[in-house]
A protein has these predicted regions:
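Glycine-rich phosphate-binding loop plus the immediately following alpha-helix
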Residues: 59-67, 78, 93, 98-127, ...
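Phosphate/pyrophosphate-binding loops at sites that engage ATP/ADP/AMP, CoA/4′-phosphopantetheine
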Residues: 8-21, 120-124
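Gly/Thr-rich phosphate-binding beta-strand-loop-beta motif of the actin/hexokinase/Hsp70
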Residues: 1, 128-150
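Short acidic/polar capping segments at secondary-structure boundaries
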Residues: 81-86, 136-139
Length: 227
């Protein structure tokens, strides 16, 4: 379905497939990676189809790119995938030895924004020390220096967002899960796509919330300010 939509857009824009020399897609939830470009191959496609780190639309990027590129005999790539993990080891440590923090986040967007800032200010990206925030269905906050995403507060740890529940009180979360009757998969779906603004206001579009506030909705203002 998504591939067909892409092909239709290319047709509308008069892009000739035989003139393409390569295709670049968003990287999905692969095992931890260093930042940069990776060529899509059969192993990557299999991993994303069968053993992704978690379910997410970004897993489709490399799969679709490969499906378009192969018949044309051109390479497909991903760049700065979701699982770029260049965090300093000390920052991965938590209060439970069985659990560690992971460098999963909106790396493509935040690294691109950091590089754009560096260019606009006549600096080398590797010489900058920046805090970059991604605002979308989830919110992630990155610390970037030395040319790496050195630390990240991802959409599981930080503020709630239009769709994500964000960081939650751990003891209360455990109690709630035990009493909810939900499976682990159902609970994760609730936290990932039915939390935040969706949970409180029933919408995932901040522009709609802003209209509610303009119309005098005090509860909407409270929730928006909390986010």
């Amino acid at each position: 379905f998504r591939k067909d939509m892409i092909m239709e857009v290319l047709k509308e824009k008069n892009v000739k497939l035989e003139e393409l020399t390569g295709i670049v897609a968003r990287g999905g939830l692969l095992p931890p990676l260093q930042a940069g470009a990776y060529r899509v191959n059969d192993d990557m496609v299999w991993q994303l189809k069968n053993k992704p780190a978690m379910e997410h639309a970004s897993n489709l990027g490399a799969i679709i790119a490969d499906a378009i590129a192969k018949p044309l005999g051109i390479p497909a790539f991903i760049y700065d995938g979701v699982t770029v993990d260049e965090m300093m080891p000390i920052l991965k440590i938590t209060g439970l030895k069985e659990l560690s923090r992971k460098g999963i986040g909106h790396n493509l967007n935040t690294r691109a924004a950091a590089m754009k800032y560096a260019r606009e200010h006549g600096k080398e990206y590797k010489d900058c020390k920046l805090i970059v925030v991604h605002l979308g269905g989830g919110i992630s906050i990155t610390l970037q220096y030395g040319g790496k995403v050195a630390d990240i507060i991802n959409d599981e740890d930080g503020p709630f967002a239009p769709e994500r529940a964000g960081g939650l009180p751990s003891q209360d979360l455990i109690k709630y899960f035990g009493q909810s009757g939900m499976t682990a998969k159902e609970m994760l779906k609730k936290m990932k796509s039915r939390g935040g603004l969706v949970a409180h206001l029933g919408v995932n579009d901040s522009r709609e919330v802003e209209k509610m506030i303009e119309n005098g909705d005090e509860h909407a203002k409270l929730i928006y300010d909390a986010m």
